[in-house]
């Protein structure tokens, strides 16, 4: 491959050197900010050697080359553009300037939640392992693994302790991540999160029960009666409080003399935010988060297969808009209240959609004669089955439309089936074949049935529609 030639073609098809504001690359994609997207020749980019897909998102135009190739194309591109190496965060910042309010909101939530996902995934998967080990009848009728092997009881309890940690101390993780995103000191954000789950406070998990029994303790400060209750497992209170903390900190630094800054600024920022957190932000945020999770769970449980069908059908188009990033916050809230919600229904539906996109992509590979397209479709389809849908969706399915439509239909029908049987996940993970450990043990069989339905329908429809398209072309 002539990478200099490929890079020059990319520049030309993007509207020329003067139309490019910033450029970087990640593991598989060129990430470019252009001044005018109307100048982009999408058909021309599609025909450039090595290009596996393209799409616009978050103010950036991204071209998929794949690992091992993208870095070489970028090296040639940056040389031709006369720019130094840029980080993806720098390009993202440049792209953000072009985004609307809704896009910035979605990106903001993603920037906060994506860094903490490994902790949530680890805790969630361990929670799934704990559930499998303690579920009666999962391996042996009327008994669980601990009943069969009492010697591992402490190990199982230890697994449960680790599994719960990210959710119990979720405000600490979110406080750090959100305050950093809002431009404040992340360690002050972590301290704020610690305050919200301080052991001296009543357990936030049992707030409703404690309130019903009349056992709530109070602080009496400035004539206010403030509940001494923690915010374990909550999302909204710490997000809002982190924004207040960062805003206060930045404004205080403007007026506090530099020699007093390290003393006065953190003191007043944390004290004022803490007071607001327990008097206004926390109580309102707790109710808002509870209403959101309760409302979504009620809709899923009430609408049943109809709600599942609608959500499953629309999930892939939602992914295209980037709005699916907001689901991380909702899922985190649902999992944090798993005893009440039973888990998250979003993850299984996302898995049905991903499986459908992967199967449709493989169906396209089966029916198409173009060797280049097949070379892209096979690995992309396998990737989607494993939970990474980007290459399949943008590289093949959307490009030819009928695989994408077939996948939407497969996802809708399979999501209706799993919704009918109330399939839920008790952990996050890769939404696809690797997501099996995340599913509630009593839902595992129907989850597998759902994946089979999703893949079968998407693959079959893609082959039928593909052959029909070929006949029309002839």
From Swiss-Prot:
Domain of life: Bacteria
Active site: 26 (phosphocysteine intermediate)
Pfam family, one: PTS_EIIC
Record bears the keyword Cell inner membrane: yes
Membrane-spanning residues: 109-129, 158-178, 182-202, 229-249, 264-284, 303-323, 345-365, 376-396, 403-423, 444-464
Keyword Secreted part of the UniProt annotation: no
Catalytic EC class: transferase
Compartment(s) where it occurs, according to its Swiss-Prot or TrEMBL record: Cell inner membrane
InterPro entries listed in its UniProt record: Glu_permease_IIB, PTrfase_EIIB_Cys, PTS_EIIC, PTS_EIIC_1, PTS_IIB_1, PTS_IIBC_sucr, PTS_Sugar-Specific_Components
Residue span, PTS EIIC type-1 domain: 107-474
Membrane topology type: Multi-pass membrane protein
EC number: 2.7.1.211
GO biological process, one term: trehalose transport
Cellular component, GO, one term: plasma membrane
Reactions catalysed, as given in the entry: N(pros)-phospho-L-histidyl-[protein](out) + sucrose = sucrose 6(G)-phosphate(in) + L-histidyl-[protein]
One of the record's GO molecular function terms: kinase activity
Principal location: membrane
Keywords: Cell inner membrane, Cell membrane, Kinase, Membrane, Phosphotransferase system, Sugar transport, Transferase, Transmembrane, Transmembrane helix, Transport
Residue ranges constituting the PTS EIIB type-1 domain according to the UniProt record: 4-87
Role noted for this protein: The phosphoenolpyruvate-dependent sugar phosphotransferase system (sugar PTS), a major carbohydrate active transport system, catalyzes the phosphorylation of incoming sugar substrates concomitantly with their translocation across the cell membrane. This system is involved in sucrose transport.
Swiss-Prot/TrEMBL domain comment: The PTS EIIB type-1 domain is phosphorylated by phospho-EIIA on a cysteinyl residue. Then, it transfers the phosphoryl group to the sugar substrate concomitantly with the sugar uptake processed by the PTS EIIC type-1 domain.
UniProt name for this protein: PTS system sucrose-specific EIIBC component
Gene source species: Pasteurella multocida (strain Pm70)
Source lineage: Bacteria, Pseudomonadati, Pseudomonadota, Gammaproteobacteria, Pasteurellales
């Amino acid at each position: 491959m002539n990478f200099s030639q490929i890079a020059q073609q990319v520049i030309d098809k993007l509207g020329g050197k003067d139309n490019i504001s910033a450029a970087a690359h990640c593991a598989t994609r060129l990430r470019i900010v252009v001044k005018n997207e109307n100048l982009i020749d999408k058909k021309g980019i599609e025909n450039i050697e090595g290009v596996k897909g393209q799409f616009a998102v978050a103010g950036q135009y991204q071209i998929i080359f794949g690992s091992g190739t993208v870095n070489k194309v970028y090296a040639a591109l940056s040389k031709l553009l006369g720019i130094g190496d840029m980080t993806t965060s720098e390009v993202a910042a440049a792209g953000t300037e072009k985004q609307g309010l809704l896009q910035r909101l979605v990106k903001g939530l993603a920037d906060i939640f994506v860094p903490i996902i490994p902790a949530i995934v680890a805790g969630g998967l361990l929670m799934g392992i704990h559930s499998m080990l303690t579920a009666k009848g999962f391996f042996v009728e009327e008994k669980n693994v601990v009943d069969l092997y009492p010697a591992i009881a402490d190990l199982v309890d230890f697994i449960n302790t680790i599994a719960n940690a990210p959710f119990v101390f979720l405000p600490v993780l979110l406080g750090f991540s959100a305050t950093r995103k809002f431009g404040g000191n992340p360690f002050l954000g972590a301290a704020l999160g610690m305050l919200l789950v301080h052991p001296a406070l009543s357990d936030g998990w049992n707030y409703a029960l404690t309130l019903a029994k009349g056992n709530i303790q109070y602080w009496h400060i400035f004539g206010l009666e403030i509940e001494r209750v923690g915010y374990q497992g909550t999302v909204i209170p710490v997000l809002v409080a982190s924004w207040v903390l960062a805003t206060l900190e930045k404004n205080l630094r403007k007026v506090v003399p530099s020699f007093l800054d390290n003393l006065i600024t953190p003191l007043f920022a944390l004290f004022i935010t803490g007071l607001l957190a327990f008097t206004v932000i926390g109580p309102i945020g707790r109710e808002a988060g509870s209403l959101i999770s309760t409302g979504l769970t009620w809709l899923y449980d009430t609408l049943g297969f109809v709600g599942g069908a609608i959500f499953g059908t629309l999930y892939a188009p939602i992914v295209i808009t980037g709005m699916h990033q907001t689901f991380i916050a909702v899922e985190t809230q649902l999992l944090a209240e798993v005893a009440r919600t039973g888990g998250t229904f979003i993850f299984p539906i996302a898995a049905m959609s991903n499986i459908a996109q992967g199967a449709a992509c493989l169906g396209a590979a089966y029916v198409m004669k173009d060797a280049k397209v097949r070379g892209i479709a096979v690995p992309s389809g396998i990737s989607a089955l494993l939970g990474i849908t980007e290459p399949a969706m943008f590289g093949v399915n959307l490009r030819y439309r009928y695989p994408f439509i077939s996948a939407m239909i497969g996802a809708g029908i399979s999501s209706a089936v799993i919704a009918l049987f109330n399939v839920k996940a008790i952990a996050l993970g890769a939404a696809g074949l690797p997501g099996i450990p995340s599913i509630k043990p009593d839902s595992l069989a129907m989850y597998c049935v759902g994946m089979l339905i999703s893949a079968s329908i998407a693959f079959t429809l893609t082959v039928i529609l593909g052959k029909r398209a070929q006949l029309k072309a002839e």
